[in-house]
Amino acid sequence: MTDKIRTVQGRVISDKMDKSFTIAIERKVKHPLLGKFIRRTTKLHVHDENNEARIGDTVEIKECRPVSKTKSWTLVRVVEKAVEA
């Protein structure tokens, strides 16, 4: 089986859940009529076994079997920590 595992990067927007967090993935889509590029956001719930991610972190996630009703992604690594103010 040579299926490639899907991985994406996004920014953590919520970490209030236990062993879970929510990320936002931004992409740019061209408007069909105006031709202008518009930002679109996708929110995903991610499984985080060790509660590593914090709000503002940039993380890499991969697709996995469904962990719950809304979670079918798991944390691979924290790419960049958020800047603490």
From Swiss-Prot:
GO terms under cellular component: cytosolic small ribosomal subunit
InterPro entries: NA-bd_OB-fold, Ribosomal_uS17, Ribosomal_uS17_bact/chlr, Ribosomal_uS17_CS
Biological processes annotated in GO: translation
UniProt-listed Gene3D superfamilies: Nucleic acid-binding proteins
Gene Ontology terms, MF aspect: rRNA binding; structural constituent of ribosome
Superkingdom of source: Bacteria
Annotated keywords: Ribonucleoprotein, Ribosomal protein, RNA-binding, rRNA-binding
Role, per record: One of the primary rRNA binding proteins, it binds specifically to the 5'-end of 16S ribosomal RNA.
Assembly mode: Part of the 30S ribosomal subunit.
Family to which the UniProt record says this protein belongs: Belongs to the universal ribosomal protein uS17 family.
Record protein name field: Small ribosomal subunit protein uS17
Species annotation: Mannheimia succiniciproducens (strain KCTC 0769BP / MBEL55E)
